[in-house]
Amino acid sequence: MQTMGGEHLLLSQLKGSFFLLLLAYFFRGRSPYYARCYRRLAVTPGAITIAIAIATDSIPALAKSKVLVSVCSHTDPCTASCNLIPFPRPFSNSLTRFLFCLGSARFCISFPCFGLSI
């Protein structure tokens, strides 16, 4: 099976998992809470969704087609309702907004944020 960009789905999933594991590594010394959250997400089906969005740059299409589902609810304590903050022009792309998504006073990945960040 291929993503919208023509890339094989398994390769996209691996990219997504790798990306999340990199985030976990980055946060490991700074915030064990976030590191644990990203590690958990890396081994869930949510990595596929992230990977497809990154690989194909089709976050708006995915959000509009309601393919995105909240993985946070399956990775407690990483649950959040998402409120986005404005970003300066160079940082206003969907991926940056996604990474800086705010939820209940904590930073957390919450897939409905994609729909709000566009």
From Swiss-Prot:
A single GO BP: autophagy of mitochondrion
Consequence of gene disruption: Increases frequency of mitochondrial genome loss.
Transmembrane segments: 7-27, 41-61, 98-118
GO terms under cellular component: mitochondrial membrane; mitochondrion
Keyword Mitochondrion: yes
Record has Transmembrane helix as a keyword: yes
Subcellular location: Mitochondrion membrane
Name of this protein: Altered inheritance of mitochondria protein 26, mitochondrial
Species the sequence originates in: Saccharomyces cerevisiae (strain ATCC 204508 / S288c) (Baker's yeast)
